[in-house]
Every structure is written in structure tokens, then in C-alpha cells.
Design a protein with these regions (language model features):
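Bacterial N-terminal signal peptides
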Residues: 5-14
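An N-terminal assembly and electron-transfer interface module characteristic of large anaerobic redox
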Residues: 20-520
Length: 520
């Protein structure tokens, strides 16, 4: 029977998760988040490599291998962070691993359960939700001790879910008044500077990966604003709670949504903040050079998120950063300097507008008129919207809120529709008489010399592309007697302006172009 005992022991060894020859437990961390930015998790693993061996995997994509084809059962323990449906593609593989080894779910929203109860190990969530290099090391040490190995385990270091952070400060501020006192003291005019909120995720700071946020903060200061940088752990953490009765003048939102779970709650938060959220984004897939070479700016897979962001009133989406991967495999997010300047300049303009009395604000309301003439005016025919009626309602609302809409009675829907058709519609190329009549009816007439001064500010490469397709300025669209004409109706400081004509109106051959058409 000795042979049977030996065989049983050998079989048992094969069925048990493998242990390295050094006796160290082997752990697999499967995480879609760490896969994208594994730098600090790897650094944490190096801190405890004498006590535990950690391998990193994702679900495809990112900077670590996929678990596809990997025998996870050979590890002593698998840490799983895989929110969303992608994990279901590997459900058979993960269930097979659970039959042979321990699986502990660490990421919220993971659709596959483990075989270790997370509630029995509350420190695991504390390590994971406060993901610094130190806490990753603590997590890996904790799992080694969970497996029965005598490893020293540091307590998790926790951070507030809402705080104010500045790269020059020693640590985060939990109170807005303390932060403002510190920040204002750094500038002679600190008390009068507009307050520019910057809302971002805490994980960037904890991962030592807040270069884009730091660039925004410093650019706000350079342009004469006072940054109010707020980190949040998740999208349910409300910046308005931290601000209290303080009011910011503009908000730069480093995310696609104010509340990913509830758009209505996001709208309510925007209303509490009292300013429109100005979106900025980091391209997580491409580096700066690849982003510069792209025609679209945003990656195609961002289209859905951009559309959803509009549900919360988030406007002006801009890319301000991209991924940078070093030769040693470390990764970070790098700011795109020109984009950062532009994002902040727009925020500063919004701040000036926010401080301006309504009666002094000047507003342009564009309306659809892509085809020349009266028939295609107001809104796109496919949308079935009553643009004229909506504009009338908007003019009444503006007047009620103190905007300068002139002294004349606001026209009714039919009267406005008639005025738009008679004086506010675009004109087909070559109809110079009607263009001159538009100027007499109050249209804006931009002298060519003035336009050329503006045009010269654009990059030469862009100007060359534009002129190769449409010819030199002013072109054939809405131009007469050395002037570019924009039909408008004026109501005090509120201007209704026709949408520019579609480029192929001047050159039907443009429709046969391959690729993107340049602006006209």
C-alpha cells in the first residue's frame, strides 16, 4: 500500500495550487484597472517580494498580459477586480480556478463571486480603495498572511473621500476655508481672483499620477485664477458638500459625468454648484504624439460617453492629456500643454461671464440654416423641432432674468418665423443683390482685412488644407464686395445668427472627397 500512499500524495500535490520553491505564496491580481496603469501596484509588490510573489493580469488590452489561456488554479490565491460584462467572457475559466484555489473579489461591480467572503476581511477593501504603493504592499502582505504565512502586515492608510489637493501643499485639505486661506496667501491679489473649480478622481493623486491635474492647477494660477482642486473617491461624492456656501466661478470637470449612476443626480449637483461643468479628458489609449496625429481629437470609443455627458449639462469637451509609457514599462498620464492652456482660458472666460451682471452679457443664439433660402431655417427638418417657438420662449426667459433683450415687444412665433425668413436666412453663392440687401437689413459684414487678421492666427498647415479644398479667403460662401456676411436679428444684447452654410453649397465636388473635409 506504500505505492498507493505515494501516488495519493503526488496527486494531491498536483491538485493543490503551486507554491514557489522558496516557500513564498503565489498571488495573481486580475484587474482591468491595474492593467491600464500597473506602475504603483508593481512597486507595491516589489516592497514585499521577499514574502509573496505577485503576477499581474488583465482581461485583454492594457500593459499586462491577459488571463486568456492562463491556469489561474496554480496560484495560491486570485485577487479579482473585473467590473462590467467583460469578466463574463472568462466566466468558465474563473469558475474553474475557484474549484482549485482561493478567489477574493476586491473590485466593486465584479459580476463573478469569489469563494472568500470579503465581509470577513474588511481591511482588503480599505487597502484597495486607497490604492497607494504602500497600500498595495499592505494588501499583498495581508493576503500572504491570509494563506497562513507569518508576514508583517501594516495597517491600511486611509484618505478622505472628498478633499482639496494642491501639488505644492504638504497634504490634502478637508475644509474649504483652510485651503482658500493657504492658497490666497500665495498671491498678492489672491482675494480678488476668480475661483476655478477642478474636480477629479482621488485615485490620480494616490497613484502619484496627477500630472495632468497639476498642470491645470498651475495654468489656472498663471492665467490669474485661484484653483479650487477637489478630489473625490467616486462619482457619488459631492463637491458641493465640501464647498458648502462657497461659490466657484467656473468648474473644470476631469471626467465624463458628475454622477455615473444617476444622470438626474448629476444635474442636481450641477445646479447646486451653480456653474456649467466644462469637461476635460485624458486619452487613456494613445500617447501625445498619436493624439496629435488623429483627426478626430477624441477616440471613437468615447462617443457614447460624450453623448451621455450632455444629459448632465456638461459642455466643451476637450482632451488635455494622454498616456505616456516609459521604456521600463512605467506609465503615467502626461499633459498636452496647448490643450491645457486652452481649457483653462475657456474656464477663465466662463468665470468672467459668471461675474458679469446679466444686463451686460452678450449672447448669440445660432439657428439652423445649412441650405440657402427661407425653406431650411430654424431647425433641421429631420428633427421636427419648433425652433422659432423655442427661441421666443427663450427670449422671454432671458428678459425675465434681467438680460438686455431690447425695449421692443418680443415677437410671437409666427412673426419671428417671418422675420427670420425675410432677413435672417443665408443666401446661395452668386446672389450678390440679396447679400447686399442682408447688409442693409442689419447683417454683420466682416471686412476681408479684419478676417484675414483672424485667419492668420491659425496654423499654416491648417490654412493650407483649407485653401486646397475651398480656395483662398473669402471664398464664395456669403461673401460680397470684400465682406463676409452673417445674417442676424438683434434683440438688445441678444443676437440670433444663422448657422453657416454647408461647404458643398459652394463646391458640390467636395461630397466626393475621401476622408474628412476641412472647415470652410
Amino acid at each position: 500500500m506504500k505505492w498507493f500512499a505515494a501516488f495519493a500524495l503526488a496527486l494531491l500535490a498536483l491538485l493543490q495550487p503551486a507554491v514557489a520553491q522558496t516557500g513564498k505564496p503565489r498571488i495573481a491580481l486580475v484587474s482591468i484597472h491595474v492593467a491600464e496603469m500597473p506602475t504603483i501596484a508593481r512597486a507595491g509588490a516589489r516592497r514585499v517580494e521577499g514574502a509573496v510573489s505577485v503576477d499581474f493580469y488583465g482581461l485583454g488590452g492594457g500593459l499586462v498580459p491577459s488571463i486568456e489561456g492562463i491556469d489561474l488554479g496554480r496560484y495560491n490565491l486570485v485577487l479579482l477586480d473585473a467590473p462590467g460584462p467583460r469578466a463574463l467572457n472568462f466566466s468558465t475559466q474563473l469558475e474553474a480556478a475557484k474549484a482549485r484555489t482561493k478567489v477574493l473579489v476586491v473590485g466593486a461591480g465584479t459580476p463573478i463571486a469569489g469563494n472568500i467572503d470579503p465581509q470577513a476581511h474588511p481591511d482588503v477593501a480599505r487597502y484597495w480603495n486607497n490604492a497607494t504603493e504602500e497600500n498595495y504592499a499592505g494588501l499583498f502582505a495581508y493576503t500572504a498572511r491570509l494563506l497562513g504565512h507569518p508576514v508583517a502586515v501594516p495597517a491600511p492608510v486611509e484618505f478622505p473621500s472628498l478633499a482639496l489637493w494642491h501639488p505644492e501643499a504638504k497634504g490634502p485639505f478637508s475644509a474649504i476655508d483652510d485651503y482658500l486661506a493657504w492658497e490666497r496667501a500665495r498671491f498678492n491679489d489672491g482675494a480678488s481672483r476668480p475661483l476655478i473649480g477642478i474636480l477629479f478622481y482621488r485615485s490620480l493623486v494616490l497613484a502619484d499620477n496627477a500630472g495632468v491635474v497639476a498642470a491645470l492647477i498651475r495654468e489656472v494660477e498663471r492665467q490669474g485664477g485661484l484653483p479650487v482642486p477637489i478630489w473625490r473617491e467616486g462619482s457619488r461624492d459631492r463637491a458641493s458638500k465640501l464647498l458648502g456656501d462657497r461659490r466657484i466661478d467656473a468648474l473644470i470637470l476631469c471626467a465624463n459625468r458628475l454622477d455615473y449612476a444617476d444622470a438626474a443626480a448629476g444635474v442636481a449637483e450641477a445646479e447646486r454648484l451653480g456653474v456649467p461643468p466644462l469637461m476635460c479628458a485624458t486619452d487613456y489609449r494613445r500617447d501625445v504624439e498619436a493624439w496629435r496625429k488623429s483627426l478626430g481629437g477624441f477616440a471613437p470609443d468615447a462617443t457614447g460617453e460624450l453623448a451621455l455627458s450632455e444629459l448632465e449639462g456638461i459642455v466643451e469637451p476637450m482632451v488635455v492629456g494622454a498616456r505616456a509609457v516609459a521604456t521600463d514599462g512605467t506609465a503615467a498620464y502626461a499633459p498636452i500643454a496647448g490643450q491645457v492652456r486652452w481649457r483653462v482660458a475657456r474656464a477663465m472666460a466662463w468665470a468672467r461671464l459668471h461675474r458679469l451682471p446679466n444686463s451686460e452679457k452678450r449672447i448669440v443664439i445660432p439657428y439652423h440654416n445649412e441650405e440657402p433660402g427661407e425653406a431650411d431655417i430654424g431647425s433641421d427638418p429631420d428633427s421636427y423641432l419648433d425652433a422659432q417657438g423655442s427661441i421666443v420662449a427663450l427670449l422671454h426667459r432671458l428678459r425675465a432674468e434681467g438680460y438686455d433683450t431690447g425695449t421692443d415687444p418680443i415677437p410671437g412665433r409666427a412673426q419671428l418665423a417671418r422675420r427670420l425668413a425675410e432677413a435672417g436666412s443665408n443666401v446661395r453663392p452668386g446672389d450678390d443683390a440679396t447679400l447686399r440687401r442682408r447688409i442693409g437689413q442689419g447683417a454683420i459684414a466682416v471686412p476681408l482685412r479684419t478676417y484675414l487678421d483672424w485667419y492668420a492666427e491659425l496654423p499654416k498647415a491648417l490654412r493650407d488644407t483649407v485653401e486646397a479644398r475651398w480656395g483662398p479667403p473669402p471664398g464664395r460662401i456669403m461673401a460680397v464686395d470684400g465682406k463676409i456676411v452673417v445674417p442676424v436679428l438683434r434683440f438688445g444684447k441678444v443676437v440670433l445668427a444663422a448657422h453657416p452654410l454647408w461647404g458643398p453649397q459652394a463646391d458640390a465636388g467636395a461630397l466626393a472627397e475621401k476622408g474628412a473635409l476641412p472647415p470652410h
